[in-house]
């Protein structure tokens, strides 16, 4: 199931996240200042601020990917229908009866508009605008130009289909090439966590036992490492999103994941707080 996220949804999501997060932060500073739980609630607030926008971005990205994956399939079916002798308008009406993921609803609207007498070019351009992806808009413009070509429209549509498929393949290849960089960001974060566990359990704790370090110094060191780890988790997540998906907002989910993992590791294996 695909869910389309509007600009209004994103504004409401950000407003709700920031509002709840700021409420947690204000309460934290007012009631937990100096408490062992002070840092915990800062992390909870940060996760809350990132969580809803991360979910909205994921749903939006899923919608866009679903549309762009199905556009070449739609064009290919339109090409085959025209080869079989169907006029372009009739081919679109038949395609509207099939399943093309998130494109299905918009395609049905386009078929209805054509049936109601709206010019073909206008209906197709409206389709591209409603879907809203760069690939959909390009495909819509190419379809309009092809419809004006006259004879052998199906040959032109075949060229368009191949062109659009190539554009989609290039985009997927770019994302695949950037995935290793996202992986490197995660590896760097996990290396930091591993080193922290080694330091605290093999060096700091024995040092306190044999009086080389005071217990206060050990606890302060753990808190410093915790804060460094949480800062790295948040910022590394944003970097992973920028490198892997080309958008900082795409890194919010990585930030949430790293913050959650980092918090659990520090509580369970480092013994902070």
Task: Provide a role label for each language-model segment.
Residues 74-77, 81-154, 158-162, 168:
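Glycine- and small-hydrophobic-enriched helix-loop-helix hairpins
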């Amino acid at each position: 199931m695909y869910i389309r996220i509007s600009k209004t949804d994103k504004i409401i999501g950000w407003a709700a996240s920031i509002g709840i997060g700021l409420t947690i932060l204000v309460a934290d500073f007012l009631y937990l200042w100096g408490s062992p739980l002070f840092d915990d609630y800062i992390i909870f607030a940060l996760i809350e601020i990132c969580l809803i926008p991360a979910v909205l971005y994921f749903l939006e990205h899923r919608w866009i990917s679903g549309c762009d994956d199905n556009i070449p399939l739609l064009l290919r079916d339109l090409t085959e229908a025209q080869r079989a002798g169907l006029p372009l308008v009739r081919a679109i009406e038949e395609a509207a009866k099939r399943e093309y993921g998130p494109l299905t609803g918009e395609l049905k609207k386009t078929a209805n508009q054509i049936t109601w007498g709206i010019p073909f070019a206008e209906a197709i351009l409206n389709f591209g605008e409603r879907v809203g992806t760069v690939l959909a808009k390009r495909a819509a413009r190419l379809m309009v130009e092809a419809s004006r070509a006259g004879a052998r429209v199906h040959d032109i549509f075949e060229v368009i289909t191949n062109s659009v498929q190539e554009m989609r393949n290039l985009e997927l290849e770019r994302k695949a090439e950037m995935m290793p960089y996202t992986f490197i960001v995660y590896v760097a974060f996990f290396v930091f966590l591993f080193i922290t566990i080694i330091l605290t359990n093999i060096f700091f704790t024995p040092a306190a036992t044999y009086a080389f370090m005071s217990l206060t110094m050990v606890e302060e060191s753990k808190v410093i490492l915790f804060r460094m780890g949480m800062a790295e988790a948040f910022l590394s997540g944003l970097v992973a999103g920028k490198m892997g998906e080309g958008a900082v907002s795409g890194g919010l989910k990585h930030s949430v994941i790293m913050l959650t993992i980092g918090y659990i590791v520090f509580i369970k294996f480092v013994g902070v707080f």
